[in-house]
């Protein structure tokens, strides 16, 4: 929203029922889905979409397990439009999006910086899907 994306174009997927309620109050024009990111493709299709332009994630990919990380990252890159981006915020200095998956989708990985305002500070990684 702060980057100029209209609130009514936001799709927010959250597993915590309490946080879903909060998001609906704070972003009343956004589509807020109570669900699991591992079911991302199902959630996106359920609202009539086939692709998305960008995904921003704060999911703790490193600690959610290798299989869940693979499922989520593949789903994101599969849903992205060509030229779209997957931004991942993490507390680890290395990109948690598996390079093998990035390469399958001919993505380009880059380090976007450190979110110093976050506590603790977080690393921001970006994968752009080949156009």
Where do the language-model regions lie?
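Conserved SAM/SAH-binding beta-strand->alpha-helix loop
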Residues: 16-17, 36
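A short SAM/SAH-binding and catalytic strip from SAM-dependent methyltransferases
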Residues: 49-68
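Conserved SAM-binding strand-loop segment of SAM-dependent methyltransferases
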Residues: 29-43
